[in-house]
C-alpha cells in the first residue's frame, strides 16, 4: 500500500502516548485539536512526527500520572489496560463479542474489610486493574487472589460443568505463577504499565 509500515507504527506509538499524556495533563478532546492537526500536516508533507512544539516535562508528566485517579468510568483507564494486555506478544485476539470489564486483582471488597494496603489509593491504581471477561468478573470480583485463580484458569463445578477461564494471557500467567497478589505486586505492575 501507500503507507510505510515502520513509519506508521512509529506514528501510532507516538500519537497514542501523546493522547494519553494529554488526557492526564489537559483533559478534553478540544485540547488535542491543535497539536494533532500540526502533526497531520507533517504526515501529509512527509515530515517526521515529533510533537516538538508540544513536548512534556518528563518529571511533571510522571507526577501527573502518579497523581491521576484511574477510575473505572474514565475511558483512559480501559484504553490503557487494553493496550497493556496486548503488549504481551502471546495475547491472542479476543472475540468482538467479548464483553470486557475492569477487574481489581486485589479485590476492593478485601481492602474495605481488611484495610491491609498501606496506601489505600493502590487499590484503584492501574497496577491493580486488568481487563477481564464480564462472565468471569461477576464470579471473581470479591475474592482473595488465591480464590480467584480458579476463575482465571477455568474449573469444573460441582455439577461437572466446565467453566472456561479468561483469555487474558497476563492473568493466566499470573494465576500459574503466584499464590497471592500483594501491595508490592500492585506497585511493581503499576510502574511497568506507566
For each of these PLM feature ranges, what is it?
Residues 1-78, 173:
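A cross-family structural signal marking well-folded subdomains
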Residues 5-8, 24, 28, 92-95, ...:
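Extended hydrophobic-aromatic, low-complexity segments
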Residues 5-13, 74-75, 96-99, 120-127, ...:
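Conserved structured core elements
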Residues 19, 106-110, 130-137:
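Short, flexible loop/turn elements at secondary-structure junctions
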Residues 20-27, 48, 73, 89-93, ...:
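Residue-level signal for secondary-structure boundary elements
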Residues 75-101:
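Short cysteine-rich loop/turn motifs with clustered Cys
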Residues 93-125:
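Histidine-centered nuclease catalytic patch
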Residues 123-125, 129-194:
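Long, cytosolic, alpha-helical-rich C-terminal regions that act as interaction/scaffolding modules
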Amino acid at each position: 500500500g501507500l503507507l510505510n509500515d515502520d513509519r506508521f507504527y512509529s506514528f501510532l506509538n507516538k500519537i497514542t502516548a501523546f493522547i494519553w499524556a494529554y488526557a492526564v495533563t489537559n483533559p478534553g478532546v478540544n485540547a488535542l485539536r491543535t497539536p494533532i492537526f500540526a502533526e497531520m500536516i507533517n504526515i501529509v508533507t512527509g515530515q517526521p512526527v515529533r510533537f516538538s512544539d508540544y513536548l512534556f516535562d518528563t518529571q511533571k508528566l510522571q507526577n501527573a500520572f502518579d497523581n491521576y485517579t484511574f477510575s473505572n468510568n474514565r475511558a483512559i483507564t480501559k484504553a490503557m489496560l487494553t493496550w497493556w494486555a496486548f503488549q504481551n506478544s502471546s495475547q491472542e485476539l479476543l472475540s468482538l463479542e467479548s464483553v470486557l470489564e475492569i477487574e481489581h486483582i486485589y479485590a476492593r471488597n478485601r481492602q474495605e474489610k481488611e484495610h491491609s494496603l498501606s496506601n489505600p489509593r493502590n487499590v484503584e491504581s492501574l497496577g491493580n486493574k486488568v481487563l477481564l471477561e464480564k462472565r468471569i468478573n461477576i464470579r471473581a470480583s470479591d475474592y482473595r487472589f488465591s480464590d480467584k485463580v480458579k476463575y482465571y484458569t477455568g474449573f469444573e463445578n460441582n455439577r461437572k460443568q466446565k467453566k472456561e477461564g479468561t483469555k487474558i494471557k497476563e492473568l493466566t500467567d499470573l494465576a500459574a505463577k503466584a499464590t497471592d497478589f500483594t501491595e508490592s505486586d500492585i506497585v511493581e505492575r503499576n510502574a511497568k504499565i506507566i
